[in-house]
């Protein structure tokens, strides 16, 4: 098991890196009796439990409130923190390994001046310890005696609607795995997943990142996604629920008028953004793709000029994202 591997690594006098890309204590708090859950008033998201600060915090807009003692819905006393964050994992590892130093590395634990330098000193000392952290721990750090990397909850990148999620997951797992065995000592990587037979995970683990990337490219070619089609996303947001969508409907109508229906240009949307409401603003997207970059650029050049003249353009905040890295 993962705990056994951690225990043996510590006994060997080496260091362990535990990776969990989710800060806080737990990603949700719910009532066992009525099902109430703490949600952000400004965003379409749940509030994350930060127990060390006794706060519920939105990781999108930074809205905060105290952790309630009673359920606001039914006044029940059984409020349950669901899921794992770095705080909770740190607490659990401290209980399992009371004689071993456990160091959490995330945006919350490194706020104070000098905190990150202290992490580097601990990691560089070579003394047995457990480093647990988010993505900020995965890149560019050389700790020679880290011989075990444990990745918790690798599944989150497998089921995202963003077509680039598999690519990012492969890059992240490769980066994290690269923290193990960087010195003269051999390294080991444990990946916790509910999908050990997932084809992409099997390729990444069994055949390496190069073959993994080739497989992703083959899938992109089959589904005609970038880089085999050229894409732009027009984003619009407004503090009124329907204005952003209305603006993008007009944008699509104008675009279709500029170019007669053609297999060379495709449209999707307008659709709600993955997080439709963020910081009190409603967000929609219109995706445009073309077989050639020159065709897409010509359309966008004319379309942007037309959109700037729309009256609705003053009531919404809009932008054009060419080759979007996030959907």
Language-model region placement:
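Inter-lobe coupling/hinge segments of SF2-like helicase ATPases
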Residues: 1-245, 249, 253, 257, ...
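Extended, charge-rich low-complexity interaction segments
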Residues: 128, 289-308
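A common structural junction motif
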Residues: 252-261, 303-314
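A carboxyl-terminal module marker
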Residues: 253, 257-259, 264-278, 318-326
């Amino acid at each position: 098991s993962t705990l056994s591997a951690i225990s043996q690594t510590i006994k060997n006098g080496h260091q362990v890196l535990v990776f969990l890309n989710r800060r806080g204590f737990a990603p949700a708090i719910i009532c066992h009796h009525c099902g109430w859950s703490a949600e952000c008033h400004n965003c379409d998201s749940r509030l994350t439990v930060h127990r060390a600060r006794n706060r519920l915090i939105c990781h999108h807009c930074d809205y905060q409130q105290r952790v309630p003692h009673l359920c606001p819905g039914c006044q029940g006393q059984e409020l349950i923190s669901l899921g794992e964050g770095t705080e909770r994992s740190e607490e659990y590892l401290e209980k399992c390994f009371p004689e071993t130093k456990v160091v959490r590395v995330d945006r919350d634990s490194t706020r104070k001046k000098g905190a990150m330098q202290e992490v580097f000193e601990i990691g560089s000392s070579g003394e047995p310890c457990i480093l647990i952290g988010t993505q900020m721990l995965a890149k560019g750090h050389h700790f020679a005696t880290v011989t075990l990397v444990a990745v918790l909850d690798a599944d989150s990148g497998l089921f995202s609607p963003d077509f680039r999620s598999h690519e990012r997951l492969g890059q992240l797992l490769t980066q994290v795995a690269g923290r193990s065995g960087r010195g003269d000592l051999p390294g080991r990587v444990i990946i916790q997943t509910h999908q050990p037979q997932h084809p992409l995970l099997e390729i990444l683990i069994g055949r390496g990142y190069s073959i993994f990337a080739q497989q992703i490219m083959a899938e992109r070619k089959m589904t005609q996604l970038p880089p085999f089609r050229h894409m732009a996303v027009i984003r619009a947001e407004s503090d009124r629920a329907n204005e952003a969508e209305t603006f993008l409907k007009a944008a699509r109508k104008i675009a279709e008028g500029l170019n007669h229906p053609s297999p060379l240009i495709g449209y999707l949307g307008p659709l709600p953004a993955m997080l439709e409401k963020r910081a009190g603003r409603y967000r929609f997207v219109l995706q445009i793709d073309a077989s050639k970059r020159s065709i897409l650029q010509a359309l966008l050049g004319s379309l942007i000029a037309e959109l700037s003249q729309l009256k609705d353009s003053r009531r919404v905040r809009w932008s054009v994202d060419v080759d979007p890295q996030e959907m």
